[in-house]
Amino acid sequence: MSEKQYTDPIYELDGKISVSKAIPFGLQHILAMFVANIAPILIVAGVVKMPVEQSGALVQSAMLVAGIGTLIQLYPIWRVGSGLPIVMGISFTFVSIACVIGAKYGYGGVMGAVLVGGLLEGFLGLGAKYWRRLIPPIVAATVVTSIGFSLLAVGANSFGGGFGNPNFGDAPYIIVGTITLVSCIAYNIFAKSFYKQLSVLFGLIVGYVVAYFMGMVNMSKLAEVKLIAIPQLMPFTMEFHPDAIFAFFLIFLVSATETIGDTSAMTAIGLRRDVKEKEISGSIVCDGLVSSLSSVFGCLPITSFSQNVGLIAMTKVVNRFAIMTGAVIMIMAGLFPALGVLLASLPEAVLGGCTLMMFGSIVVSGVQMIANCGYNSRNVTIASLALSIGIGFTQTPAIFKIFPDLIKNVFAENCVAVVFIVAMVLNIILPKEEEE
C-alpha cells in the first residue's frame, strides 16, 4: 500500500471518522475474536461440571468484560490502559491451570485466585521501566514472531472445523474455509481505497452465508434467550487457597510477557515506532486489574488478543474510535443475549478461513522487526536460539516430563512464554561487546 493511501484518518490513532465508517471495522475485530473469547469459559465450565444455565450466563459476562477491558485499553483511566488499539478477551493461557484448580477446589477457588493474581499483576505493571529493560527491540521482535507462529495452529484448527470436533477435517469444513479465504483475497484485490481493509469482514459474511445454506449454522438457541439480561455480580462464592493463588500468579507473569509482545507488535506494526514505557505499563496494569474485575463477574482472566494484532498487521487500521465501536458491540452482546447468540453462531471453519492470512501477517511482521534490529551475531543468536527452543520444545511437550506439573502446565504448550524467557536471559548474559 502506498504512503498516499495511509493518509486516510482510518489509519491514524485519533483520526476523525464517522460512526458509519467506524462500525464495519469495529465489527470485523469482534468477529475475529468472538469465538476465542467465549471458548475458555466453556472448557473450564465443562471440567468443573457447571450447570448449562450458569455457563451460559458466564458467556454473556465474558462479552461484557471484554468490551469494558477494550474500552479501558483504548481510553486509559489514570495509569490503567495503554491508549492503543488493543482488543481484550478471555485468555486461553489460563485454561490449563484453571482446569487443575477447578477440579481441586471448585470454580470458587479459581475465582479467588484470579482476583488476587490480577491485583498482583496490576501492581507489578506499574514498574514499567523494569519491564522495558528486559525487552529491547530484538527481544520484542523475537516474541512477536513467536506469537505469529503460535497462532498458525489455531487458524488451522479452526479451518478444519474446530478443536475437539469429532468430524474435524471433513469436506464441508474445508470447503467453507476455502471459500472464506478466497473471498478475503478476492475482496482485497478488487476493492479500492480503505475498503480493502474490510476483506476479513467480507470473507466472514460470505463464509457465514455459505455455511448457513450448508446447514452448519445453529440458530435454535435464538428463540430461547431473553431480550435483555444483566450479568450477575459475584455469581460464585470465592475461596482463597495459597497454592492456587501462587499458581495463577505465575501464569499472570506469563500472560504479562504475551501482553508486552502484543503491545510491542501493535506499535511497531500499526504505528511504525517503538513502544513507550507508559504503554507497556498501562497494558499490563489493565490486564491485571480488569482480570480482577472479570472474576467479580465469574469470568477467567482477560488479556490482549494476538488475533487482533494480526488483523491490524494485515489492515494497518489503528483508529481508536473504530475499535471502540467494536467494544461497544461486545458490551451490547453482554446485555442483549440474542446478539451474543447470533455472533456465537459463526462456524469455526469460517473463522479459520479468515485467520490464516491474519496470523501469517504477524510472522512476517516479526521477521521484519528482527531485520530492523540488524543481523549482527548477538541478535542472530538471541532470535534463532529463542525461537528454536521455544517453538521446538513446545512442539515436543514430552521434553518437559522431568519438571513439576506446575512448570509443565505453564510452559509445555506455551511457546510465547518460553521464547520470551530464553530471549530475555540471552539478552542479559550475552556481552554487548560482541555486537558488530
Residue ranges and their predicted role:
Residues 101-220, 325-436:
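Membrane-embedded alpha-helical modules
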Residues 1-25, 220-233, 268-275, 279-283, ...:
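Intrinsically disordered, low-complexity non-transmembrane regions of multi-pass membrane transporters
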Residues 20-32, 169-180, 198-199, 214, ...:
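Hydrophobic, membrane-embedded alpha-helices of multi-pass small-molecule transporters
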Residues 19, 45-81, 249-320:
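Membrane-embedded helical hairpins/re-entrant loop segments and their flanking transmembrane helices
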Residues 1-85, 93-101:
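N-terminal signal-anchor module of multipass membrane proteins
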Residues 57-58, 79-92, 133-142, 195-201, ...:
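Short, non-helical or kinked segments that cap or interrupt transmembrane helices
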Residues 3-7, 37-41, 45, 180-190, ...:
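Juxtamembrane interface elements at the cytosolic ends of transmembrane helices
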Residues 190-205, 227-236, 248, 261-285, ...:
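Hydrophobic, small-residue-rich membrane helices and short re-entrant helix-turn-helix hairpins
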